[in-house]
UniProtKB/Swiss-Prot annotation:
Gene that this polypeptide is encoded by: gba-1
Role description: Glucosylceramidase that catalyzes the hydrolysis of glucosylceramides into free ceramides and glucose. C.elegans contains specific sphingoid bases, which are unique or different in structure compared to the sphingoid bases found in other animals. Two examples of these distinctive compounds are: 15-methylhexadecasphinganine and 15-methylhexadecasphing-4-enine.
InterPro entries: GH30_C, Glyco_hydro_30, Glyco_hydro_30_TIM-barrel, Glycoside_hydrolase_SF
GO molecular function (one): glucosylceramidase activity
Source organism per UniProt: Caenorhabditis elegans
Signal peptide, first to last residue: 1-23
EC number: 3.2.1.45
Entry keyword Kinase: no
Annotated GO CC locations: membrane
UniProt name for this protein: Putative glucosylceramidase 1
GO biological process: glucosylceramide catabolic process
Glycan attachment positions: N168
């Protein structure tokens, strides 16, 4: 009887090709717009391990109904089953190499981590940076203060100190940035850090203020520009004294913001032309002459994609500037409006990587900044990553690691949502649906993976897809069913052009994200 029962189970799995495995428990809390997972010192859900063998696939699903990286094991079938969507992946056609995903060590993030018990903040770092968590590969580090700081500060407020003798890090660095960078490095020793200034010290600007509009005084090559270049080098040197080195450096966060007369936050105006001239005359040579800066990858733009490709053309067509540049930083706030700009930029400048340097949800003036359990923000996050990956981007970075219930702290009340929200009074944190949306990419797509060709048999406007080949030969397919127009569940059949005998059959629920991880040694 027992052998007959086991035979029936085997036949069921062979026919239907799915073996459901319960995910690690999420302590759910439901709100008007959706569900969060509550984490404390007693419990916190984790990503279920792959636990598959050659020829099997693991399917992870997150949905608006509450599934959070629920895992099913998919068994390949040698006959093509019925499906409403047929997807073919072809690893012989390769595109960009993926560098990884990341988040930002903002003052606000550090303040919130510090507000929690040490073991709980350590758990957050593990959830973000370990290979059992989101496996983040990048950390963005602000140079001095931002809108997500408790106050406005620079590293040298001594006017006319062109040699930067009075440069010094602040309490925010020693309390909120450096400790948590090191904590993250404990879980990912290969973490790539890139720094970005929101503003030059006020005395270097035309307005004499860090906040609001204004450019650097003078022009490239003068005392002001030379001093600002030294400011960058001194930052790298001082962090080096704490054992922290940097992979990359942005010339300026959102340089176009400095032209906005209504802008209230820290900013410094650069045009493409003035950024080009600053790089080739001042910053590039200063970094090249510095032991802490000579190997740093310099990023240009670090602003919305609508500035491309013209911005890249202006800087990178000048060989005296381009020789110092590693890549192009892009923000997410015009995504969906200007899809072809990334593709066009890559075609013109294929030797320079494109990196997503900032993205967030809930930043609009009329938005509910922190909206617990909001599924649409998870879908928007996934859609943004899918769009960027399919248009030559090599990585993607979240604006904050963790914020409070207001979406801060922020000295200028510039609140947003975040993947993790802190509740220090209860010694808890909430993992928003956005956290899981990021995990569908970052946990499975390994550094060095390449995007590969994929196609669907029909045009389905509500479904977005992408596919990757990992360095170990495993393949990753991410699908989003936004379901914002029509409530449609899809049955999906994935076929690998490299092995046409095997088909993977699964369900893509309405308003859901899935990741299919295929274990194979085939390249």
């Amino acid at each position: 009887m027992k052998s007959r029962f086991l035979l029936k189970i085997f036949i069921f799995l062979a026919v239907f090709g799915v073996d459901s495995v319960r995910a690690a428990d999420c302590t759910e809390k439901t709100f008007k717009t959706g569900t969060v997972c509550v984490c404390s010192l007693d419990s916190c859900d984790e990503i279920p391990p792959l636990d598959i063998t050659m020829g099997q696939a693991a399917l992870y699903t997150t949905s608006h109904t509450g599934a959070r990286l629920h895992r099913d094991v998919i068994y390949a079938t040698d006959t093509e089953p019925f499906g409403t969507l047929h997807m073919t992946i072809d690893s012989s056609k390769k595109y960009q190499t993926i560098q990884g995903f990341g988040s930002t060590f903002s003052d606000a993030s550090g303040a919130n981590l510090k507000s929690l018990p040490d073991k709980l903040s350590d758990l957050i770092m593990k959830q973000y940076f370990s290979d059992t968590g989101l496996n983040l590969q990048f950390g963005r580090v602000p140079i001095a203060s931002t809108d997500f700081s408790g106050r406005v500060y620079s590293y040298n407020d001594v006017a006319n100190d062109y040699s930067m003798q009075n440069f010094n890090l602040t309490k925010e660095d020693f309390q909120w940035k450096i400790p948590y960078i090191k904590n993250a490095q404990k879980y990912n020793p290969n973490l790539k850090l890139f720094a970005a200034p929101w503003a030059a010290p006020g005395w270097l600007k035309t307005t004499k203020e860090m906040t609001g509009p204004g450019a650097l005084n003078g022009k490239a090559g003068d005392n002001y520009h030379q001093a600002y270049a030294k400011y960058f080098v001194r930052f790298l040197e001082e962090y080096g004294k704490s054992g922290i080195s940097f992979w990359g450096l942005s010339t300026q966060n959102q340089p176009t913001l400095g032209s906005d007369k209504k802008n209230k936050i820290q900013s410094t105006l650069f045009t493409a032309e003035t950024q080009r001239d600053f790089i080739k005359t001042d910053l590039g040579p200063a970094l090249a002459a510095s032991s802490s800066g000579k190997d740093v990858k310099l990023l240009i733009l670090d602003d919305n994609r609508g500035n491309l490709p013209k911005w890249a053309d202006t800087v990178l067509n000048d060989m005296d500037a381009a020789k110092y540049v590693g890549g192009i930083g892009v923000h997410a706030y015009q995504d969906g409006e200007t899809d072809n700009h990334l593709d066009e930029t890559h075609k013109k400048h294929p030797n320079f990587f494109i990196l997503g340097t900032e993205a967030s949800e809930g930043y609009g003036s009329k938005d509910t900044h922190v909206d617990y359990g909001n599924w649409d923000r998870a879908a928007d996050t996934a859609s943004d990553i899918l769009d960027n990956m399919n248009n030559w981007m090599t990585g993607w970075t979240e604006r904050n690691l963790i914020l409070d219930a207001l979406g801060g702290p922020s000295w200028v009340s510039d609140y947003t949502d975040a993947p993790v929200i802190a509740f220090p009074a209860m010694a808890q944190f909430y993992k928003q649906p956005m956290f899981y949306a990021i995990a569908h990419f970052s946990h499975f797509i390994k550094p060095g993976a390449v995007r590969i060709d994929h196609s669907l048999n029909v045009i389905e406007l509500e479904v977005e897809t992408t596919a990757f080949l990992n360095p170990d030969g495993s393949k990753v397919i991410v699908m989003l069913n936004k379901g914002s127009l029509v409530s449609t569940e899809h049955t999906v059949v994935v076929q690998d052009a490299a092995d046409s005998r095997n088909h993977y059959h699964f369900t893509l629920p309405h308003r859901a994200i899935t990741t299919l991880y295929i274990q194979t040694s085939q390249f």
